[in-house]
């Protein structure tokens, strides 16, 4: 650990203590020697005793800077780990930081382009359009066609700063893991690893550009979603250039009302977009918070979404998708036994889990949800409560499902903000049922066979040779097994013979010793002893030497 990381660690601990976050730790983590060290190294008092633990954590992360703000935002989606009170506070963290110098942005852009900005762009504005913890955005026009574009560039030295903070977080998480011991539900190392993967993915703008291109191609003819065009020839790990858009922020409800937006259609399209991305394309935008979503200004009666920032994308395996769809359908059919089975069959919880106990725990959590109308039930909270319940049965955390849960909560919250009467179930159920029918029906089977047919046709001429090779290999295995069996039987016979001789020799030696004390003929003890010794030597030397078969 470097001196700089030690200083940073001291600053982080000091900040957390200033907000009295040691007060919320369990007693086993604050023994007398912890309190002694705290008072010796940090002459700090908690000045925020009137605030809740969640609010204090939010303020501390806000003060610690961008990396911790993003960590807090991620933690706000892990409601399977945190209480709603803490999660709601962290959700209010805003990734807004002062912009860095426009001259530095110009320098960073020209380093990536290996040419002056004016070689490719006109009207470059050194005053940023937007600024965040990892990057900031500048406007310009393309010299080749005059189209308006935005240039997204990483902050100077941001990678080194993030790596240093991640190392510190990882080391701290390991210490907390050790203190809490096995079986703790917080699992800090797991949380930090999820965060590390997420934030490092955001540091590669070339990857973000490729994600945006793929998502755009998936929705080229869509009336519901528009992804701005990416100029791939100008995209690098630290620079991304894309079409400039002029939509209305989805959070600006007043502006959307003023232009006469069809809120019902917009909310329903948001739900359809989510399920289309997950179940049709298996490629979903996993960072759909309001800052990344805009609404079209044209045709407010037929509005569409504009999606930005494709740095965090999610995918699911075919198995995950099937089990997820079945989970939702089983929940709304109140089939808790099937839900428990699905969690075990999918490998999300151990196969050793007590099925009846798990089913009962799911029923206790889910049954009260049906006390309210179906249109008020939240898909995201259903998934969340199921994960929370599974936590008590040692669920194997699936990062892709955590991303899905976060995205679903965003989409639901957004949909009900736009149109409070949104019936999520009625919107999603036909989609889920159609997808399930396509996966398990005759058409699905025919499609899978058709997909595999070219491969089988290509391999068909090789089948006779493969059969011959397998038969030949089988004969070799049988011959090898027979040889091993013969060796084993021979070993057993030798061992049996040796043991018989050793036992007999032991009996003769014991008898010879006893006869010395009895009224026996003079030669009897000697015969027994000599015979016993001879048999012992023969038995010992006849022991099988090699146990390898």
UniProtKB/Swiss-Prot annotation:
GO terms for biological process: regulation of ubiquinone biosynthetic process; ubiquinone biosynthetic process. Its EC number is 2.7.-.-. GO terms for molecular function: ATP binding; protein kinase activity. It comes from the Bacteria. GO terms for cellular component: plasma membrane. ATP binds at residues 129-137, 152. It is an enzyme of class 2 (transferase). It is found in: Cell inner membrane. Keywords: ATP-binding, Cell inner membrane, Cell membrane, Kinase, Membrane, Nucleotide-binding, Transferase, Transmembrane, Transmembrane helix, Ubiquinone biosynthesis. Pathway: Cofactor biosynthesis; ubiquinone biosynthesis [regulation]. The active site is at residue 287. Residues 123-501 form the Protein kinase domain. The keyword Lipid biosynthesis does not apply. CDD domains: UbiB. Belongs to the ABC1 family. UbiB subfamily. NCBIfam families: PRK04750.1, UbiB. This is Probable protein kinase UbiB.
């Amino acid at each position: 650990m470097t001196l700089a990381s030690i200083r940073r660690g001291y600053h982080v601990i000091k900040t957390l203590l200033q907000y009295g976050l040691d007060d919320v730790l369990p007693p086993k983590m604050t023994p007398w020697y912890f309190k002694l060290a705290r008072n010796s190294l940090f002459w700090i008092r908690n000045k925020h005793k009137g605030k809740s633990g969640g609010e204090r954590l939010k303020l501390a992360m806000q003060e610690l800077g961008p990396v911790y703000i993003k960590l807090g935002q991620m933690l706000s989606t892990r409601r399977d780990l945190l209480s709603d009170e803490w999660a709601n506070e962290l959700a209010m963290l805003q990734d807004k930081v002062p912009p860095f110098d426009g001259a530095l942005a110009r320098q960073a852009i020209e380093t990536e382009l290996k040419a002056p900005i004016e070689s490719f762009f006109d009207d470059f504005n050194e005053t940023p359009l937007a600024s965040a913890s990892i990057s900031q955005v500048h406007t310009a026009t393309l010299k080749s066609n005059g189209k308006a574009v935005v240039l997204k560039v990483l902050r100077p030295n941001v990678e080194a700063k993030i790596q240093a903070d991640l190392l510190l977080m990882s080391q701290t998480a390991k210490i907390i893991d050790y203190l809490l011991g096995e079986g703790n539900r917080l699992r800090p190392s797991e949380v930090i690893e999820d965060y590390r993967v997420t934030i490092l993915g955001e540091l590669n703008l070339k990857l973000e550009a490729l994600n945006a291109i793929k998502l755009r191609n998936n929705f080229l003819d869509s009336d519901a979603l528009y992804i701005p065009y990416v100029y791939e020839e100008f995209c690098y790990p630290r620079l991304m250039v894309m079409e400039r858009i002029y939509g209305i922020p989805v959070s600006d409800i007043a502006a959307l009302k003023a232009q006469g937006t069809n809120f019902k259609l917009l909310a329903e399209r948001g739900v359809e977009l989510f399920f289309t991305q997950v179940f049709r394309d298996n490629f979903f935008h996993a960072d759909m918070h309001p800052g990344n979503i805009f609404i079209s200004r044209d045709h407010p009666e037929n509005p569409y979404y504009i999606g930005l920032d494709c740095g965090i994308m999610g995918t699911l395996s075919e198995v995950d998708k099937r089990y997820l769809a079945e989970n939702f359908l089983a929940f709304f059919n109140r089939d808790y036994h099937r839900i428990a089975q699905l969690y075990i069959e999918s490998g999300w919880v151990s196969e050793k889990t007590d099925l009846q106990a798990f089913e009962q725990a799911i029923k206790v959590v889910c049954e009260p949800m049906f006390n309210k109308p179906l249109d008020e039930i939240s898909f995201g909270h259903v998934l969340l409560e199921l994960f929370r319940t599974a936590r008590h049965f040692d669920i194997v955390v699936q990062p892709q499902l955590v991303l899905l849960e976060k995205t679903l909560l965003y989409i639901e919250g957004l949909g009900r903000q736009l149109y409070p009467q949104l019936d999520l179930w009625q919107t999603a159920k036909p989609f889920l049922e159609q997808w399930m029918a396509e996966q398990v029906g005759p058409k699905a089977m025919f499609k899978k066979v058709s997909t595999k047919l070219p491969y089988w046709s290509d391999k068909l001429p090789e089948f006779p040779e493969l059969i011959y090779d397998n038969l030949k290999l089988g004969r070799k295995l049988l011959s090898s097994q027979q040889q091993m069996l013969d060796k084993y039987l021979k070993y057993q016979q030798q061992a049996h013979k040796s043991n018989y001789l050793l036992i007999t020799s032991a009996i003769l030696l014991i008898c010879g010793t006893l006869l010395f004390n009895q009224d026996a003929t003079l030669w009897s003890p000697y015969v027994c002893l000599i015979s016993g010794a001879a048999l012992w030597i023969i038995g010992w030397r006849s022991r099988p030497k090699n146990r390898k078969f």
